[in-house]
Each structure stands twice: as C-alpha cells, then as structure tokens.
Amino acid sequence: MLLLFDVGNTHTTIALTKDGKSFDIKRVSTHSIQTEDELYVFLKMFYRNDFKDIVVSSVVPNINYIFEFFAEKYLNKKAIFVSAKEYNEIIWNVNTPEEIGADRVVDVIAASRDYGKDAIVVDFGTAITIEVLKENRYEGGVIIPGFNMMVNALFKGTAKLPKVELKPSDTFVGKDTGSNIRIGVINTILGGIDYTIERIKSDYDLKSAPIIYTGGQSKLIREYLKKDIIYDLELGLRGIYYFYENIAC
C-alpha cells in the first residue's frame, strides 16, 4: 500500500491506496500536526503500518521535514516529494519548471493520464489555479485569490464589512451586506474563471479540451457548474499516484 499526502496551505489530505483507483482518505488541518511523532500517532489510529512508500505533494515547504523524519524514523524509508523536474512524460514549457507548485504538477499529470493530452484544470484551494495542457505540453497557468482570501481581504481592509461564511446564492443581487459580499465574491471569481477559460480556449486552440474542476473549495460552486465541466475531487491524489508510478519504473 502507498501512503499519499496532499499538503495544502489550509488542509492536508492523507490517502492510502493500492492501485491509484480507490483511496482510503482522511483530512486534517495542515498545521495541526507539528512533529513526526504526532503524525505517527494520528496515522496509527486509522492505518496499519505496512506502507510500501510515502509520497508527498506539498505546497508548504517549511513542514516537509515532518514527512521526511516520519518516513525515516517509522518506516525506514525516504519520503518521495512531487516535483515537475522528476516527471518526464510531460513537457514543462515554462521558464522555471522547478517553481511549479506540487499541487499543480499532480493536477496536470492526472489530467494528462485520465482525460487526454489537451486539458484545462481549475483547482479551488486557498488560492485558485488554472492549468493549461496542450498536446501533453504544460503551457503554464493562472493563479487568483481563493474564496476565503477575498472574504478576508474585504474584512481586514475595511472598517465595517463583516467576515462572512460563503454559501451559494440563487440571486445576483443581495439585500444585506453579508449577501452582497457572498454574491460578489463567488460571482467575481466564477466570472473571472469563465473569461480566462474562454481566452485560453481561443489562444491555444483548446475549444474541445475537457475542463476539470477540483479542490476542496469547489464544493462551494458545484451547483453552478456548466454541463460540460468535469467535477473530479480525487484528481490530485491520482496525480500523486501516477507520479510515483513514473519514477518507480
């Protein structure tokens, strides 16, 4: 069994898998586990200690040592960390491939393996990323503030606007300050994504490319999805598995 970690800025997804198709998933706050010993105690509650390897996709480099120490101390193994430069089945057509976030790398890998050589991926996390895959070449992407980042910016940058909890709305105009913020944030982000995708389709001749939405925050906008959009919450986990498959061969 492989032990996979998808370490995000806010939450970490932990998954156990044998084949990269089905996953036994747990989720924790990223900064709730501070040491390799705490990680061991947490995992022991749910999993047997029979891991073939440990593979980590992390966008929080200052806690990577926890996974390194855990693998060495409790598994007598070296943790494997996702990076674009280690994966050779995709051409990383950007200035500095080593700077591509691991979360983006695994999204692109899984999109390529599961949906074809052309794809557009939108990952709704703390920040929202849009990835462009053209003929199995990663052409780059876009990063925009996530839902909660925009809410927090309004709250911290003004004297009176409240911090609200986001939820879908069936109207485009709010009747109170809270609904004004909710509608404004969600519609601004969705409108920006729609515009960006249309430009990408036109500029890169990707009019028939599949569009995949993923990431924990995508649940907020699931009911707004157009019929041609694919909703795939396990895209990143499969990407981690495919990365391991590639480098283990």
UniProtKB/Swiss-Prot annotation:
Keyword Cell cycle included in the entry's annotation: no
This protein's GO CC annotations: cytoplasm
Coiled coil regions, renumbered to chain: none
Keywords associated with the record: ATP-binding, Coenzyme A biosynthesis, Cytoplasm, Kinase, Metal-binding, Nucleotide-binding, Potassium, Transferase
GO molecular function, one term: ATP binding
Pfam families: Pan_kinase
Co-factor(s): NH4(+); K(+)
Cofactor annotation comment: A monovalent cation. Ammonium or potassium.
Name of protein: Type III pantothenate kinase
Originating organism: Thermosipho africanus (strain TCF52B)
